[in-house]
């Protein structure tokens, strides 16, 4: 039997939004506290536009533990091992688990009407966390 090394090129990971605070530089934490409720409301609105609630809920049935691999290292390794995946390219997550990086630093990175310093702060916070994952 031939052996193959499997590298996934479409994995997603993100921390639960409120937990990003500890990964931000302290000077950005007040802005984070103010922005978090707005970000969560925007994600909930996006869910209404992009997800069919009933289909999403049906798909998620029985998958909660595996989906927690988006932020739980132990669960992620278990799922990857079960799938035979040896490595992965990881993208920041977003709508389905509400675990997008702060200040718009996730997928669909906005380019207008954003504070670039805060966006970079969100990206750095995500990368700090990702280095621990």
Whereabouts are the PLM-identified features?
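Helix-coil boundary/capping segments in enzymes
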Residues: 1-133
